[in-house]
């Protein structure tokens, strides 16, 4: 199973930037562990989801704008935590025995908190939960692939970094909407984009996995037959 986003570590261009490497080195020098950074990502997601939720009930445009700015900021801080925990663990050599759990579990909670928060904020909790469910399912298929001995499939079109880009962009665009009409069309569209995009991602990853499993089985069968003939 080869292609874009395949392997055992999510391909991120930001990992090779000077600022990220400098920040990771500083974090490594401190007593902060990768697990603590991963746990902090859930806090950032909770703050993002809470900001989205409260923005829908804000009494004035000014308060709503402030909450949307905070939501965008916390979405990006969630991604920053996701970047740094891996860098501190791998490049910093501070990986822990339970690291694989904390590398995955907080991400699932974070997606749920953010998208459920958006849904509640625009009075469409069902859509928010649908986006959250499909987001979690993308990771499930990826981990299912790894559990069956295949490389992790980080392909899109709606992988984690794409989902956070949509959420952040929607929060910022909603500032204009808040000042103009006070509606929530931008966030509604964003949830649909995440839900549908995540569903497509699930199908794409599932198709890759099934195809690879069949190819592997066929290869093993051919090798077995060839071995019998050689004997």
What are these regions (language model features)?
Residues 1-72, 113-231:
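Hydrophobic alpha-helical transmembrane segments
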Residues 12, 73-77, 107:
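Short secondary-structure transition/capping motifs
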Residues 80-88, 101, 105-109, 137, ...:
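Active-site His/Glu-centered metal-binding helix of metallohydrolases
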Residues 64-100:
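Glycine-rich active-site/cofactor-binding loop and its immediate structural neighborhood
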Residues 87-127:
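Basic, amphipathic juxtamembrane/active-site segments
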């Amino acid at each position: 199973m080869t292609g874009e986003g395949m392997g055992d570590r999510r391909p991120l261009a930001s990992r090779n930037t000077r600022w990220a490497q400098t920040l990771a080195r500083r974090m490594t020098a401190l007593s902060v562990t990768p697990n603590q950074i991963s746990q902090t990502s859930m806090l950032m997601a909770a703050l993002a989801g809470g900001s989205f939720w409260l923005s829908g009930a804000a009494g004035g445009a000014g308060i709503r704008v402030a909450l949307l700015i905070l939501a965008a900021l916390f979405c990006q801080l969630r991604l920053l935590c996701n970047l740094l925990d891996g860098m501190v663990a791998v490049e910093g050599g501070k990986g822990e025995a339970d690291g694989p759990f904390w590398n995955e579990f907080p991400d699932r909670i974070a997606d749920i908190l953010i998208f459920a928060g958006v849904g509640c904020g625009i009075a469409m909790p069902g859509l928010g939960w649908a986006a959250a469910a499909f987001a979690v399912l993308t990771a499930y298929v990826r981990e299912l692939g790894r559990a069956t001995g295949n490389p992790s499939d980080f392909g899109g079109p709606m992988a984690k970094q794409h989902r956070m880009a949509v959420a952040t962009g929607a929060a910022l665009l909603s500032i204009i909407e808040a000042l103009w009409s006070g509606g929530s069309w931008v966030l509604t569209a964003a949830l649909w984009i995440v839900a549908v995009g995540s569903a497509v991602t699930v199908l794409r990853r599932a198709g890759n996995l099934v195809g690879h499993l069949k190819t592997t089985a066929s290869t093993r069968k051919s090798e077995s037959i060839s071995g019998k003939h050689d004997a």
